[in-house]
């Protein structure tokens, strides 16, 4: 399959690129700069430099491929319009065809809860409150579309766990947690996340939302203690001041999940080390 990939130099997208190539697919990677083009070319992709918010241009690129995976995100206030533009181009190019499209969401869209799954009500925090409207454009259309919903992604010393590893210390040298640390995080290794993108794409089906998550569900205090440090909770108002209110409120969500039955039906199961082990003796300990 010839697959158009966005975000091919990113934390998740670079692993998706590697696994697509490993599975024998040809990859056309849309990038924003010549430097990024060199990086994806070195990974075996055909680079195309362009603007993902140019819907007409992107639709033209999409018409020449067999499927697409969208992992790119500016990660700022422009994210809603960015995703709307990409989805608009995909609908123009893939609408009414059998070409599979895989979109990216995030676990925070479900808000706090235990035993959450794909069918749980959406209750996003302010930071990702825009996602349901954009995702409805993906799902309520004539696309063969799926949305991978990654948990807090970890592995290779990257991602949000570094907010715990690199947290400030109090006067006694204790690691300061995000809030009181009792909240659970859904988590997933980045390599397992990439494997799910490939499995969803290769299914050729409209899978709806598919969670990329393990059943580890550590608390933030578990993560802090896994670094080998003594830990101390932080009042919510101080966490909000330190990290920004919207970001902090997302990190303060208390979420618990099981491995997705939908993902399992596609042959997926988590293979990577747990986040607690990664923090204790794996890639984060090595980077620390």
State where each predicted segment sits.
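A conserved pocket-lining segment of Rossmann-fold NAD(P)-dependent short-chain dehydrogenase/reductase
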Residues: 166-188
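Mid/C-terminal beta-alpha module of Rossmann-like enzyme folds, strongest
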Residues: 2, 196-247, 286-288
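NAD(P)-cofactor binding segment of oxidoreductase domains
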Residues: 57, 61-102
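Conserved beta-loop-beta element that borders a ligand/cofactor-binding pocket
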Residues: 135-157
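Conserved Rossmann-fold NAD(P)-dependent oxidoreductase catalytic core, especially the SDR/UDP-sugar
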Residues: 26, 87-128
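C-terminal amphipathic/interface module of NAD(P)-dependent oxidoreductases
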Residues: 50, 249-288
């Amino acid at each position: 399959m010839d697959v158009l990939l966005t975000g091919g130099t990113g934390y998740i997208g670079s692993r998706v690129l590697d696994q697509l190539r490993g599975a024998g697919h040809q990859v056309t990677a849309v990038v924003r700069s010549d430097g990024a083009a060199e990086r994806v070319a070195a990974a075996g992709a055909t680079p195309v430099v362009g603007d993902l918010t140019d819907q007409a241009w992107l639709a033209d690129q999409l018409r020449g491929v067999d499927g697409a995976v969208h992992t790119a995100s500016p990660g700022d206030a422009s994210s809603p319009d960015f995703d709307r533009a990409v989805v608009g181009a995909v609908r123009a190019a893939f609408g009414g065809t059998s070409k599979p499209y895989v979109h990216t969401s995030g676990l925070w869209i479900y808000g706090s809860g235990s035993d959450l799954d794909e069918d749980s009500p959406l209750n996003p925090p302010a930071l990702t409150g825009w996602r349901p409207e954009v995702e409805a454009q993906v799902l309520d259309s004539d696309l063969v579309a799926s949305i991978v919903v990654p948990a807090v992604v970890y592995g290779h010393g990257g991602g949000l766990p570094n907010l715990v590893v690199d947290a400030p210390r109090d006067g006694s040298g204790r690691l300061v947690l995000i809030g009181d640390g009792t909240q659970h995080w859904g988590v997933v290794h980045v390599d397992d996340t990439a494997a799910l993108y490939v499995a969803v794409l290769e299914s050729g089906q409209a899978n709806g939302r598919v969670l990329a998550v393990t059943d580890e569900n550590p608390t933030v205090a578990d993560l802090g203690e896994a670094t080998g440090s003594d830990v101390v909770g932080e009042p919510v108002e101080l966490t909000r001041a330190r990290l920004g209110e919207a970001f902090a409120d997302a990190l303060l969500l208390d979420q618990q999940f099981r491995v997705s039955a939908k993902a399992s039906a596609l042959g997926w199961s988590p293979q990577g080390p747990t986040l607690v082990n990664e923090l204790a003796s794996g890639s984060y300990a090595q980077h620390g």
